[in-house]
Amino acid sequence: MPKYTLYYFNSRGRAEICRMLFAAANIPYNDVRIDYSEWDIYRSKMPGSCLPVLEINDSIQIPQTMAIARYLARQFGFYGKHHLDMARVDFICDSFYDIFNDYMRMYHDQKGRVMFELMSQMREWYAARNENSGYEECYMQPSMAPSAQMSQEVDNSDTLADCSEMRSQDSMVEPPSQKLSPELESQSSLCSERPQCGPPDPMMGSDFERLSFNEGRMLEMRRRYDETCRRVLPFLEGTLKQRYGGDRYFMGEYMTMCDLMCYCALENPLLDNAYLLHPYPKLRGLRDRVSRNQRINSYFTLRNYTDF
């Protein structure tokens, strides 16, 4: 058996899908968790200066979350039984990753750095804006959900094409800028300037000034994340219903990587907004089934609890 070493920070983050695959397959590995203060020591040793990285037999290094996850899924039997199944697993995983990636963007500064030091404060800031705006649910748009009555063969090809087109457009074109209300415009100045309405915001202090962040960018990242949820979640709910009415797994009778993605990609978004999956009962049921899997449940019991 190969020797596996997974490098990531001491958080769930982008590496959790890989850890869940190891757990589901009951395969041992070395889980190296790098403290944020030590990252500069490791940076030059990692391909692309990024994490996570999977190291195999102390020699081969594989970067990029989904490349690692797909490799492990193929090795461990969680990637479908033939090419169309694998394509289905791919577009479902990539759709969940769209949500997860836009969620992570909300906690990055303008230079692409994750703001670990301010993460708790930022979550409180977003939660306060949720309450003020009445944002509780991500409503389903029925026209975006694929029909469960369509044949599986047609569903596979059509939904794959639709998803590919969406992802291509997303990667090439930035979403159109949305004009803010006068109140929000007054909050989009640099963080060194306090908003003129309401009490002083605890987020607007020296930390934000040092990290060159501002409320306008936070609002834009939140808007992008919300739009991705409204686009992707109804599509995934409908895709799940295509097999066994959505009462088992995305591939039908057996669990694959995309079912694990349904759990880990939405774990933090659901901590921020417990209503996120309220309109999507099949996705909620799937997450329950994944968490009840004996190996996954054992992993959850033993894993290090982290806030992010």
UniProtKB/Swiss-Prot annotation:
Keywords of the record: Eye lens protein
CDD domains: GST_C_Sigma_like, GST_N_Sigma_like
Source domain of life: Eukaryota
This protein's name: S-crystallin SL18
Single biological process term from Gene Ontology: glutathione metabolic process
InterPro entries: Glutathione-S-Trfase_C-like, Glutathione-S-Trfase_C_sf, Glutathione_S-Trfase, Glutathione_S-Trfase_N, GST_C, GST_superfamily, S-crystallin, Thioredoxin-like_sf
Summary of the tissues where the protein is detected: Lens.
Residue ranges occupied by any GST C-terminal domain in the UniProt entry: 185-308
Organism: Nototodarus sloanii (Wellington flying squid)
Biased composition (Polar residues): 178-191
Residue span, GST N-terminal domain: 2-80
Molecular function GO terms recorded: glutathione transferase activity; structural constituent of eye lens
UniProt record similarity statement: Belongs to the GST superfamily.
Function: S-crystallins are structural components of squids and octopi eye lens. Contains relatively little if any GST activity.
PANTHER family listed in its UniProt record: GLUTATHIONE S-TRANSFERASE
Spans annotated as Disordered: 165-205
